Amino acid sequence: MQKVSVRMMAAMLAIVLAGSVAAAQPVRAAIPSALPGVAFTPGTTPIDLIDDRGRPVRLAAPARRIISLLPSLTEIICALDACERLVGVDRFSNWPPQVDRLPRLGGLEDALVERIVALKPDLVLAAASARVVDRLEALRIPVLALEPKTLEGTGRVITTVAAAIGDPVAGAAQWRAISTRIEAAARRVPASMRGQRVYFEVSSAPHAAGAGSFVGDVLALLGMANIVPASMGVFPRLNPEHVVRAQPQLIIGSEAALRDMPKRPGWAALSALRERRTCAFAPAAYDVLVRPGPRLGEAADLLADC
């Protein structure tokens, strides 16, 4: 069961209620039927948007000089064929490769405000939790604060970003392509994998991907059962004893995390570790799994192959 490969980004988790989501359930149910947060007709201005804080954002014209301060948002821009509009990114954005040449502008907690201002962006994309958002808005720089946590939220963010660049139709097409790929992955999950109890580790604290996260949503559609119920939060920090008591049948995480797990108190007793029923992923593959963006279809493929 153990697979260690950049080609296989896995994350098998889903809803604790076994059978509540069948592997064949259409992903389309999770796709927004309209463009929530968007009030825009192609070719018209201004563009009125609603961000993840519930705040209105008005753009006088489609954004042309964009700064992205979150890797998933960087990936969305490029998947919409607008990579050339990026003038700067956060330090963690590393896909697609062409973003490597762009100026690095810090991260969630330490964005470089002076450098951002000097680049004269007409739009900054940032996480809703980023400390820099209020400061940039005080400087009259338009900010879309977007931080999807669910599969449906990812679709909403993709369509909102597409509207911000003046091409909402491309956003809808991108989301349809993602959902189609997830559906295809769900159809080929082996029967032996469906319903398995899965633990997906996000960090060694340990933090896990809960059933209510975008990771959990994808895993539910693949027919997996998450040992971390939605009631515990999206990416909750767990008492390590929770994992030991839950006795997951499959454990998924980064290569580094899987190497460390047997050393944790009580974890050597986990049958999944003893029997190597694990999926460990190299950094590049793991990025695909934990970023709510255009590569979620690829993530579903990797999960189906775990």
What are these regions (language model features)?
Residues 70, 128-129, 202-204, 231, ...:
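Short secondary-structure boundary segments
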Residues 130-138, 250-270:
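A ligand-binding cleft/hinge motif common to bilobed small-molecule-binding domains
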Residues 92-95, 209-235:
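Alpha-helical, coiled-coil/dimerization segments enriched in small aliphatic residues
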Residues 113-121, 138-139, 237-247:
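Short helices/loops that flank or line small-molecule/ion binding pockets
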